[in-house]
């Protein structure tokens, strides 16, 4: 399996910036993060527990704003 070094990571980041643009990077990062989180939940079987916690966190954030 090939190793991914700093130059390869830099090239990937530059390609992502070129394809999506600076303005969309937060949205893309959020979507990737949610996808990884959902994958981990599904693999560990804690999906239902996390949904309840996420809803509670959302309510807390909405109240603080």
Swiss-Prot record:
Where in the cell does this protein reside?
Cell membrane
Q: Tell me how this protein assembles.
A: Forms a complex with TatC.
Q: What is this protein for, i.e. what is its function? A: Part of the twin-arginine translocation (Tat) system that transports large folded proteins containing a characteristic twin-arginine motif in their signal peptide across membranes. TatA could form the protein-conducting channel of the Tat system.
Instruction: Establish whether keyword Cell membrane is in the entry.
Output: yes
Alphabetized, the UniProt keywords read: Cell membrane, Membrane, Protein transport, Translocation, Transmembrane, Transmembrane helix, Transport
Which stretches does UniProt call biased (Basic and acidic residues)? 55-65
Q: Name one GO molecular function term.
A: protein transmembrane transporter activity
User: Encoded by which gene?
Assistant: tatA
The SS bond pairs are none
GO annotation terms (biological process):
protein transport by the Tat complex
One GO cellular component from the entry?
A: TAT protein transport complex
Family to which the UniProt record says this protein belongs: Belongs to the TatA/E family.
- Residue numbers spanned by region Disordered: 43-65
Query: Which ranges does the record mark as transmembrane?
Result: 9-29
Protein's name in the database? Sec-independent protein translocase protein TatA
């Amino acid at each position: 399996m090939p190793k991914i070094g700093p130059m390869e990571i830099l090239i990937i980041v530059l390609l992502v910036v070129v394809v999506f643009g600076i303005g969309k990077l937060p949205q893309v990062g959020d979507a990737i993060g949610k996808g990884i989180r959902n994958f981990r939940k599904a693999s560990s079987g804690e999906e239902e527990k996390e949904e309840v916690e996420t809803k509670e966190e959302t309510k807390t954030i909405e109240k603080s704003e």
